[in-house]
UniProtKB/Swiss-Prot annotation:
F-type ATPases have 2 components, CF(1) - the catalytic core - and CF(0) - the membrane proton channel. CF(1) has five subunits: alpha(3), beta(3), gamma(1), delta(1), epsilon(1). CF(0) has three main subunits: a, b and c. Belongs to the ATPase epsilon chain family. HAMAP family: ATP_synth_epsil_bac (MF_00530). It holds the Pfam family ATP-synt_DE_N. This is ATP synthase subunit delta', mitochondrial. It is found in: Mitochondrion; Mitochondrion inner membrane. Coiled coil: none annotated. One of its GO terms (molecular function) is proton-transporting ATP synthase activity, rotational mechanism. Mitochondrial membrane ATP synthase (F(1)F(0) ATP synthase or Complex V) produces ATP from ADP in the presence of a proton gradient across the membrane which is generated by electron transport complexes of the respiratory chain. F-type ATPases consist of two structural domains, F(1) - containing the extramembraneous catalytic core, and F(0) - containing the membrane proton channel, linked together by a central stalk and a peripheral stalk. During catalysis, ATP turnover in the catalytic domain of F(1) is coupled via a rotary mechanism of the central stalk subunits to proton translocation. Keywords: ATP synthesis, CF(1), Hydrogen ion transport, Ion transport, Membrane, Mitochondrion, Mitochondrion inner membrane, Transit peptide, Transport.
């Protein structure tokens, strides 16, 4: 009797599992009717409010990789408070990656690079524009577009060398007299940043 009950139970579980599991093709794309269905349902509940945007409203197709290497590199250089360069076509950009100076030309392999304090130079013909970057990231895409995001950046020709020397001396003094780990860390950051600026100006 126990064996018969076990067989009946296993059959019922298998039948329930086969009914609950439906096969369908895996897809990361949203159904085309999803947005319209959501909007209609939203209007029934809150007719006086605009419906929020669904994830598909922010989705864009991935840019296609060109069949030939472009002659120019398109650069977008963005800071938290402004866009320094937007869709700027240049010949080359040299960025201060955490692994060392990185030259970026049209057709560069797709890369994400962390930026350290240092000089970024933008080359357009014989014109070279240099910026001091505090930190950030560079996103290099297969379609020869470079998105460079920096926490802070200053054109190199806007920096006063005497103020850099003064700041370096102040932070070196703070580092020597620091008594807590926090004071040491803050002073060390100041020394490293001012040293990088000083090296860029003297180089």
């Amino acid at each position: 009797m126990f064996k018969q009950a076990s067989r009946l139970l296993s059959r019922s579980v298998a039948a329930a599992s086969s009914k609950s599991v439906t096969t369908r093709a895996f897809s990361t794309e949203l159904p085309s009717t999803l947005d319209s269905t959501f909007v209609e349902a939203w209007k029934k509940v809150a007719p006086n409010m605009d419906p929020p945007q669904t994830p598909s409203a922010f989705m864009k197709p991935r840019p296609s990789t060109p069949s030939s290497i472009p002659t120019k590199l398109t650069v977008n250089f963005v800071l938290p408070y402004t866009s320094e360069l937007t869709g700027k076509e240049v010949d080359m950009v040299i960025i201060p990656a955490s692994t060392g100076q990185m030259g970026v030309l049209p057709g560069h392999v797709p890369t994400i690079a962390e930026l350290k304090p240092g000089i970024m130079s933008v080359h357009e013909g014989t014109d070279v524009k240099k910026y001091f970057l505090s930190s950030g990231f560079a996103f290099l895409h297969a379609n020869s577009v470079a998105d460079i995001i920096a926490v802070e950046a200053v054109p190199l020709d806007h920096i006063d060398p005497s103020q850099v020397q003064k700041g370096l001396a102040e932070f070196q003094q703070k580092l020597a007299s620091a008594t807590t780990d926090l004071e040491k860390a803050e002073a060390q950051i100041g020394v490293e940043v001012h040293s990088a600026i000083n090296a860029a100006l003297s180089g």
